[in-house]
């Protein structure tokens, strides 16, 4: 569970209503794969990931990034039950995909950076602090099955 004040919940959901999930999802996942290239091993079926340009232009990266942010959107609707919301994804990533749970934290941090880049001055320190709490909560929920 993530502990957000009513004001923080309003900040998070207010900004999220302006997020273009298609674009931001692809950008966030793409940046994760570029900045942390060892994460590419989980995406062998995505084709050419040989350069930053190839990753950022890859249709499968963009599509999966959208899928990731669609799940994140569900989490935002259930901030008081992130563990339950992400239970099946946690199990999938742990038992079948064997994803290092640290990658969830990395992706959350990249997402915060992408949001800051996209929203500029609107992404105030208060917005960043609220989103940082959320991405930590989501990463913790996704890592739950690993414990």
From Swiss-Prot:
The modification N-acetylvaline is found at residue 2. One of its GO terms (biological process) is hydrogen peroxide catabolic process. Disulfide bonds: none annotated. Belongs to the globin family. GO terms for cellular component: blood microparticle; haptoglobin-hemoglobin complex; hemoglobin complex. Red blood cells. The gene is HBB. The modification S-nitrosocysteine is found at residue 94. The modification Phosphothreonine is found at residue 13. Keywords: Acetylation, Heme, Iron, Metal-binding, Oxygen transport, Phosphoprotein, S-nitrosylation, Transport. Involved in oxygen transport from the lung to the various peripheral tissues. GO terms for molecular function: haptoglobin binding; heme binding; hemoglobin alpha binding; metal ion binding; organic acid binding; oxygen binding; oxygen carrier activity; peroxidase activity. Heme b binds at residues 64, 93. This is Hemoglobin subunit beta. The modification N6-acetyllysine is found at residues 60, 83, 145. Residues 3-147 form the Globin domain. It comes from the Eukaryota. The keyword Acetylation applies. The modification Phosphoserine is found at residue 45. Heterotetramer of two alpha chains and two beta chains.
